[in-house]
Amino acid sequence: MMCDRAVLTVRLVRSFEHRNFKPLVFKDVNLDQTVDEFISFVKQDISVRAGLPPPFRKFDYDTLKIIHQAHGAKTNELVMSLEDDEKLILREGCRLRACGVANETELAFFKMTDYIKFKADPHSEW
């Protein structure tokens, strides 16, 4: 029987160029909820999470992408891989489990327009 609950790490990405991100751990996540439901949950959580700097709380995140899955190979990119978007970006309306999310998956949460801009010219400013 598959585990219905999982521990997920969500990396809040404010800037790809400056490698400005903050990882957060979410426990007891229902993998049968939709991507939209999880995005709403994360946005609500970060808006009130103690210890999270205001710039991270107020940023307009809109997209989730799988960075790493348990027991899988990690990317050499410091923020996240720029490859396999079709496979790794979570689709609206899809259930987390159906999108490939499992226990101990690490996800990036970012603004898609920033990602597209960075992907077209991937340089770092630090």
Curated annotation (Swiss-Prot):
Pfam families: DUF2340. It comes from the Eukaryota. Belongs to the UPF0538 family. This is UPF0538 protein C2orf76 homolog. It comes from Danio rerio.
